[in-house]
Amino acid sequence: MSETLLAGTAKAPSFDALTLALTRPAFLAELAEQAQIAGRSGNAFCLLLLDVDHLQNINDCHGVGAGDEVLVGLADRARRVIAEPAWHRSEYSLGRYDGGALMILARPCAASQAEMLAEALRFAVAEKPLGERISVTVSIGVAQLRIGESIDELLARTERVLHVAKQFGRDRVEVASTPPSRVARAKVVGLYD
């Protein structure tokens, strides 16, 4: 078999060379698999989208190498936070989204728990520099998968709330609202009949 043919059939790498997080395609494949599992089991999961605030300014002022250091530091800090005992009730996957953004899949996980995790991550990043004396902050969008929702819809909702966090001053967490399930609505309606 020729080298060209072998190169074409080789699997794409699963881990980002810089952050050692899952690559975007590998993370999205896991997200799709977990959505199918959640659809069968009813166990909720959440997606967190973390984006370094003003990364372009860091690259412009300190060089791309400094920006890379910040991303490596962000991935390491995220790993340390999710390894803390407070978060052991869930399993986590860390992936590289794009540019200065990382994704975390938390399963099983309610939106309220994901919001607390996001705040812990935000605080851990702001607490001390991520790299060579560069203090940074992150904005984080959080969304819980709605049963029957596509991965594209989940990603779009998570991106929207991340943009809201950026618009309202950065260094904050925003959570996408999740409408109550039909069962919860039926219980509430039953209370008022």
Regions found by a protein language model. Give the residues of each.
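PAS and PAS-like sensory/regulatory domains
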Residues: 134-138
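Cyclic nucleotide signaling catalytic output domains
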Residues: 94, 139-168, 172-193
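Short, low-complexity N-terminal regulatory "tails/caps" that precede and couple sensory modules
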Residues: 1-12
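Short hydrophobic/aromatic beta-strand micro-patches
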Residues: 105-107, 143
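Conserved long alpha-helical elements within nucleotide-processing catalytic cores of c-di-GMP signaling
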Residues: 16, 21-46, 56-80, 95-99, ...
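A short pre-motif secondary-structure segment
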Residues: 86-96
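Short catalytic/binding micro-motifs of nucleotide second-messenger systems
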Residues: 80-88, 122-133, 164
